[in-house]
């Protein structure tokens, strides 16, 4: 029996508003526990919520960027459940009239493009955060009432790789809109995954498992990969899949049962009595649409068409708005687009990944990188020397020209000076000359290495090759 995998994702994104969705409480991350709450957030008797218009604008902006249809009439509902981090015993969410529906984004895996549907995007308030210790449980209500959008995908993904690509693309689009920073480590982007298997050709979905507590895109992919194998093994051996909630454990590289779900949750939704229905007219929609900046796909196409970048470069550079904006500022300052792309995708990304940092955390600036790239273009420094300059720029900042002068890194491009060095090296390596003339191409590499060593890596490589061949041919 051949089985196919069905994957759908539910993503919660915290909106970057200055106040909470139904109160004036601040939203700063990292504040002391329970210092950013109010009687409205905690559901004291007699208090009434007031809808934050900026949260609605942000939700509309995200929905439009995800190609959703925007509702003309929408409303809020009470989702009833009891849990210590939910002091009101209900959550204000949206049930049957979400703010956005029928959206999609396009992903690419192994060179193949695929459209993933988005069922709905709705607004809701976040819950508090529980911390469990040996002495008991603690609850921080700072997060209670934070504005969230929940983005529910269609079950259109067939592999864990597609799920990873979907999350990467979704995060990129949301970051470009500016409505959220999507930092998983701070909880501003959270994901639950639903996965089931069914025989190829069957229309009915199999019984799904829900994966929770997935705190990175890599964990989402790994969790789905393990769950895919677990369910396949169970089904092929004649077993049945139970509807379960599971979590991915990095230590064991397995998904672990959290609880069995005997039926669907009954949250007894009913319309929120303290909030009126919301009507969104065309004028409001168009005002929000006009605020949407250039999104990653459009920017990627522009890089290829106008800057002549390869599609791969354009894809990597536009994955995050931070990197793309840095690239644009560097090129706008006069640097060559392709050379800038090479440095950002190579040395810069390697450094950031190794140090676990973002561009905003390092001393490198677009102006600094631009000036360094232009020094390479002019032949003032070689790419090899530029790495020494780069290390200084990204660690301490500064002016590339001043760094080159202070460290004596100016490339030697004077033909007379280089010819003298080449002649001296050849005089001391006659055997290498003979080896080269006898077809041993490695000999030329050895000679170039000796010249670079003698000039402390500052010789102009193309000029060295030219002079070296000229001098060898004279002998």
From Swiss-Prot:
Q: Which Gene3D superfamilies match?
A: 1.10.10.410, GatB domain, N-terminal subdomain
Enzyme Commission code:
6.3.5.-
Disulfide-linked positions: none
Question: Does the entry feature the keyword Protein biosynthesis, yes or no?
Answer: yes
Q: State the top-level EC class.
A: ligase
Q: Which GO terms describe its biological process?
A: glutaminyl-tRNAGln biosynthesis via transamidation; translation
Q: Which InterPro entries match?
A: Asn/Gln-tRNA_amidoTrfase_suB/E, Asn/Gln-tRNA_Trfase_suB/E_cat, Asn/Gln_amidotransferase, Asn/Gln_tRNA_amidoTrase-B-like, GatB, GatB_C_1, GatB_Yqey_C_2, Gln-tRNA_amidoTrfase_suB_CS
Alphabetic keyword roster: ATP-binding, Ligase, Nucleotide-binding, Protein biosynthesis
MF (Gene Ontology): asparaginyl-tRNA synthase (glutamine-hydrolyzing) activity; ATP binding; glutaminyl-tRNA synthase (glutamine-hydrolyzing) activity
Reaction catalysed by this enzyme: L-glutamyl-tRNA(Gln) + L-glutamine + ATP + H2O = L-glutaminyl-tRNA(Gln) + L-glutamate + ADP + phosphate + H(+); L-aspartyl-tRNA(Asn) + L-glutamine + ATP + H2O = L-asparaginyl-tRNA(Asn) + L-glutamate + ADP + phosphate + 2 H(+)
Q: Which Pfam family name is an example for this entry?
A: GatB_Yqey
Q: Which PANTHER family match?
A: GLUTAMYL-TRNA GLN AMIDOTRANSFERASE SUBUNIT B MITOCHONDRIAL AND PROKARYOTIC PET112-RELATED, GLUTAMYL-TRNA(GLN) AMIDOTRANSFERASE SUBUNIT B, MITOCHONDRIAL
How this chain assembles, per its entry, is: Heterotrimer of A, B and C subunits.
Q: What does this protein do?
A: Allows the formation of correctly charged Asn-tRNA(Asn) or Gln-tRNA(Gln) through the transamidation of misacylated Asp-tRNA(Asn) or Glu-tRNA(Gln) in organisms which lack either or both of asparaginyl-tRNA or glutaminyl-tRNA synthetases. The reaction takes place in the presence of glutamine and ATP through an activated phospho-Asp-tRNA(Asn) or phospho-Glu-tRNA(Gln).
Q: Which NCBIfam families match?
A: gatB, PRK05477.1-1, PRK05477.1-2, PRK05477.1-4
**Family to which this protein belongs:** Belongs to the GatB/GatE family. GatB subfamily.
Q: What is this protein called?
A: Aspartyl/glutamyl-tRNA(Asn/Gln) amidotransferase subunit B
Q: Which organism is it from?
A: Bacillus cereus (strain B4264)
Q: Coding gene?
A: gatB
């Amino acid at each position: 029996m051949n089985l196919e995998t069905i994957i759908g994702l539910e993503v919660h994104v915290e909106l970057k508003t200055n106040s909470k969705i139904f109160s004036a409480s601040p939203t700063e991350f990292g504040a002391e526990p329970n210092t950013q709450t109010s009687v409205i957030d905690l559901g004291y008797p007699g208090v009434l919520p007031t809808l934050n218009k900026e949260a609605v604008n942000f939700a509309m902006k995200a929905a439009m960027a995800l190609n959703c249809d925007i509702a003309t009439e929408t409303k809020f509902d009470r989702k009833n459940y009891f849990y210590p981090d939910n002091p009101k015993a209900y959550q204000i969410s949206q049930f049957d009239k979400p703010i956005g529906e029928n959206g999609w984004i396009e992903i690419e895996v192994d060179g193949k493009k695929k459209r993933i549907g988005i069922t709905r995007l709705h607004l809701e308030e976040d819950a508090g955060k529980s911390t469990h210790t040996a002495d008991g449980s603690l609850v921080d209500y700072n997060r209670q009432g934070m504005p969230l959008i929940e983005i529910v995908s269609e079950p259109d993904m067939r592999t864990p790789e597609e799920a990873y690509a979907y999350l990467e693309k979704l995060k990129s689009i949301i970051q470009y809109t500016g409505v959220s920073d999507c930092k998983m480590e701070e909880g501003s982007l959270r994901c639950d995954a639903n996965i089931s298997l069914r025989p190829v050709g069957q229309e009915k979905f199999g019984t799904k498992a829900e994966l929770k507590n997935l705190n990175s895109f890599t964990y989402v992919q790994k969790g789905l990969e393990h769950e895919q194998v677990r369910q396949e093994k169970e089904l092929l051996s004649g077993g049945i899949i139970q509807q379960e909630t599971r979590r991915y454990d990095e230590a064991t590289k397995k998904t672990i049962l959290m609880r069995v779900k005997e039926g669907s949750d009954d949250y007894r939704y009913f319309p929120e009595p303290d909030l009126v229905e919301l009507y969104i007219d065309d004028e409001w929609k168009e005002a929000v649409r006009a605020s949407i900046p250039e999104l990653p796909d459009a920017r990627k196409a522009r890089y290829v068409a106008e800057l002549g970048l390869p599609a791969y470069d354009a894809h990597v550079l536009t994955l995050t708005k931070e990197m793309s904006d840095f690239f644009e500022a560097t090129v706008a300052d006069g640097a060559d687009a392709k050379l800038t792309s090479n440095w950002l995708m190579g040395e810069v990304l390697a450094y950031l990944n190794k140090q676990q940092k973002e561009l905003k955390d390092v001393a490198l600036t677009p102006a600094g990188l631009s000036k360094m790239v232009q020094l390479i273009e002019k032949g003032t420094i070689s790419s090899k020397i530029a790495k020494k300059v780069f290390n200084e720029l990204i660690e301490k900042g500064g002016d590339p020209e001043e760094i080159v002068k202070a460290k004596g890194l100016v490339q030697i491009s004077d033909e007379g000076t280089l010819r003298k060095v080449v002649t001296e090296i050849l005089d001391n390596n006659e055997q290498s000359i003979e080896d080269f003339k006898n077809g041993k191409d490695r000999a030329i590499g050895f000679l170039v290495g000796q010249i670079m060593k003698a000039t402390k890596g500052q010789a102009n490589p193309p000029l060295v090759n030219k002079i070296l061949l000229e001098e060898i041919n004279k002998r």
